[in-house]
């Protein structure tokens, strides 16, 4: 074989291997997606209403319903496991769980250790007013925020005084909350944007086939998310 033919042979072999490699992607090193077809899906739950809600019976919440439907599409059922965020993500890192849900966002520091879906819902926060009210600037103004909502820090950074409440829907004054909730309350949203969060679901590291399948499922639900959140809050 002369030098020209040798180079051509090497090039053909390289291209063949490249095509074969692309054809087999995405892959799951631990074959999580294949395993889920043959057993229950192990789902880690982190309590975070309205995404994940603990009840006396079966868990509830928007992401709980999403994963329940996703499992059904795969021909399996979810096996629920409650725990704290760190505990659940550590278990996921070591492939002891298949999915973790709990209102996680792409700001999580765990992206170095586990996998995540693409952001499937953008949650934007604004200050809003009851119908007929006007406000030029929230500086020095009392703004109600539901207890436990981290957007309170953003409100304070704008110079407003935070009033923590159990249920913002009962407030008759300025409120800081997610846009989907403000719409449900029929409040008038101001131009005072406070924050914007991209929601994701956690999966084991490197399980690309599972991520791809879950991404495809979540994409089909993108226009339903606002309504699902509003329905969940209305159940309270």
Feature locations, PLM:
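Hydrophobic residues within well-ordered alpha-helices
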Residues: 70, 92-93, 168-171, 214
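Short, polar loop motifs at secondary-structure junctions
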Residues: 103-105, 130-133, 146-152, 178-182
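Extracytoplasmic small-molecule ligand-binding "clamshell" domains
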Residues: 22-104, 109, 151, 162-163
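Extended ligand-binding regions for polar small-molecule ligands
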Residues: 23-25, 61-73, 132-156, 195-236
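Hydrophobic/proline-rich hinge and linker segments of small-molecule sensing/allosteric domains
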Residues: 40-47, 114-135, 201-204
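Short, well-ordered beta-strand segments
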Residues: 42-46, 142-144, 175
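A ligand-binding cleft/hinge motif common to bilobed small-molecule-binding domains
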Residues: 102-113, 168-196
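Sec-dependent bacterial lipoprotein signal peptides
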Residues: 1-22
